[in-house]
Regions:
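Residues at the C-termini of beta-strands that transition into short coil/loop
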Residues: 80, 105, 171, 193-195, ...
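A short, aliphatic-rich alpha-helical micro-motif
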Residues: 105-109, 161, 280-281, 323
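Glycine-rich phosphate-binding loop
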Residues: 104, 109-123, 289-296, 381
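Short gly/ser/thr-rich secondary-structure transition/capping motifs
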Residues: 94-101, 125, 148-153, 214-219, ...
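Nucleotide and nucleotide-moiety/phosphate-recognizing core
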Residues: 35-114, 123-145
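Internal gly/pro-rich beta-alpha loop/helix module
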Residues: 110, 115-204
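Small-residue (G/A/S/T)-rich helix-start motifs and N-terminal tracts that mark the onset
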Residues: 1-71, 75, 177-306, 315-329, ...
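Active-site flanking residues adjacent to catalytic metal/cofactor-binding acidic residues
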Residues: 112, 145, 309-311, 332, ...
């Protein structure tokens, strides 16, 4: 996993103060990183437009133009002039090389957005909005320097933003790149080296980007095991029976030794599963909430089993009694999380407000309920525990179907049953869920929850 930071100004200052890396040195390395990407991916003489703003992000772009000059057909567009000392200096250098500075945008193969960096904290004016619309309309490969222009420090887009195919962010990953809203704009992300290795540039962080290598599959390596060795997951079946059965199927596909469905009514269940009217005594983890409905036996909640809580329970105040327990994983989608925030008196907010501040509200919840692991579903999944947040950006629109969340609950429940910690269960369950969906080879609109389970078996 990689560190994610709220801001990097303090990291830049640390480099200047501790390692004597001047602003000029770091800027040169930033522009070299962008140059290397272009040189490694595009043929010489490709037509490139660099659009530079008034500050240091614009200065990065002007420095890039200097490096590309003569090797590529590069044009520099500076619509609002230059203001920062570094931008003025870089422009003076570019002018001495007679780099082409244009007044009108034409056709290009590559457009590099260097208008604003990660420090944008205001709304865009009309001229900037119009310019970004123009840039977005160009049929070109689009690269963003640091952060696509229009995305502010909180990862919000108040008017419009530059649609990048590739973002080269400076020094370290920023939280603003990983909001659900930002995902539409950032494309693929690469971190630019600013003159020292990232492990030296960076300090400790409380937010982390999950990667494929962070997935630890429940591989069986015990040669004298039996079915009880790998846990017993019980799934509570409610009014919408299909949801619970999908959860149970997913749990069985992910290494769990025994699966029981708990219901007072006879269910048509696979032969591999057991049915009980009460939670079996040897249960090692519990999944509850999927399709549960309003009428259920409250006694099912009154235990200290590790559990995954989903769906309908986020609208029921009985969930409050579980929030001080250990070994509990909550898996709400945004609407359900808004309900939970209201019930816990943390905030009474709209879904829109939540989506604009997902990190903030997850942190508030985890600060109040320190024993709980909360997985907030979304385009980018956020997993919060104590003071840390883990971000899974590997999800795709393939998962935007009913039943996908039931499968996720079963995966997490299966890992809990096998002895994984709640945070490891949430991380590995989420990664397996998204990676399995990414591996689906047919049309992205056709995957069913059962297809997803089949892909999980292939991981």
């Amino acid at each position: 996993m990689q560190n994610i930071f709220d801001e990097v100004n303090s990291l830049d200052k640390r480099c200047r103060d501790k390692f004597d890396l001047s602003e000029d040195i770091m800027m040169e390395n930033a522009s070299i990183s962008m140059f290397d990407y272009i040189q490694n991916n595009f043929e010489p003489k490709t037509k490139i437009l660099i659009v530079s703003g008034t500050g240091n992000n614009g200065a990065d772009g002007i420095a890039l133009a200097r490096l590309l000059h003569t090797l590529y057909n590069v044009s520099l567009y500076i619509p609002f002039g230059v203001k920062s000392p570094m931008a003025i200096l870089q422009l003076q250098r570019a002018q001495k090389l007679n780099i082409k500075i244009i007044q009108k945008i034409k056709k290009y193969d590559i457009v590099v957005d260097c208008l604003f960096g990660s420090g944008l904290s205001r709304d865009l004016n009309k001229d900037t909005i119009s310019l970004i619309k123009k840039l977005n309309s160009l049929q070109a490969f689009k690269i963003a320097c640091d952060v696509p222009s229009g995305i502010n420090t909180l990862g919000q887009v108040t008017t419009n933003a530059f649609y990048a195919d590739f973002t080269i962010t400076m020094g370290a990953l920023k939280k603003s790149l990983f909001t659900d809203i930002a995902k539409e704009y950032v494309g693929k992300i690469e971190v630019a080296n600013l003159g020292i290795q990232r492990k030296i540039y960076e300090t400790k962080s409380k937010s982390y980007l999950l990667e494929k290598d962070d997935l630890k599959l429940p591989i069986r390596d015990n040669k004298i095991a039996n079915k009880g060795t790998y846990g017993h997951l019980s799934v509570i079946i409610g009014e919408k029976k299909g949801a619970g059965l999908l959860c149970a199927e997913a749990g069985f596909s992910f290494g769990c030794g025994l699966i029981s469905v708990v219901s007072h009514e006879l269910q048509n269940i696979p032969n591999s599963m057991m049915q009980n009217s009460t939670i079996p005594l040897n249960t090692s983890a519990l999944c509850i909430g999927m399709g549960l409905g309003k009428e259920y036996d409250e006694q099912l909640l009154l235990n200290d089993l590790p559990k995954v809580i989903d769906a309908d329970l986020f609208y029921d105040t009985k969930i409050l009694a579980l929030l001080d327990k250990k070994n509990v994983v909550l898996t709400p989608h945004p609407k359900e999380f808004c309900s939970l925030l209201k019930m816990t008196q943390i905030a009474d907010i709209s879904i829109e407000e939540l989506q604009n501040n997902r990190f903030e509200y997850l942190q508030l919840f985890c600060k109040k309920y320190k024993n709980i692991v909360l997985l907030l579903k979304g385009t980018n999944v956020l997993i919060g525990y104590k003071k840390k947040i883990y971000v899974n950006i590997l999800g795709t629109s393939i998962l935007s179907k009913g039943g996908s969340g039931d499968v996720l609950a079963g995966l997490i429940g299966a890992l809990l049953a096998q002895g994984y910690t709640p945070i490891k269960s949430a991380i590995c369950g989420s990664l397996s869920h998204t990676l399995a969906a990414s591996n689906y080879k047919k049309n992205n609109y056709s995957m069913s929850p059962l297809d997803l389970i089949q892909e999980i078996k292939k991981l």
